[in-house]
Amino acid sequence: GIRLHLRGDGRRYTWRLTTDARWRGRQVSYWADFDTRDGEWHTVDIPFAGFIPRFRGYRLDGPALSSDQITGMGLMIYDKQDGPFDLRLASVHAY
């Protein structure tokens, strides 16, 4: 899984993994949402089994994430709320 040490603002964020996996010839990414605590440093563990396959934001029925196919990662705010945000990321680890 992915372990994040961060300080948040109480909003929900999405961790995205890009992979070599394909769906109809196009690259599949895997998303997992996580909540933050306003103003508190804390650790978030996201098990690989918690990542959902997506293509351009649309949920797919498969395939399950294979950690050996991960090619990149990123962080998104995808809660559809306008306004400022404050997320401080201290570390990212795989476990």
List where the protein language model places each region:
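Extracellular ligand-binding interfaces
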Residues: 1-59, 69, 83-88, 93-94
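Eukaryote-biased detector of low-complexity, proline/serine/threonine-rich segments
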Residues: 64-72
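Short beta-strand-plus-loop segments that form exposed binding edges in beta-rich domains
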Residues: 75-82
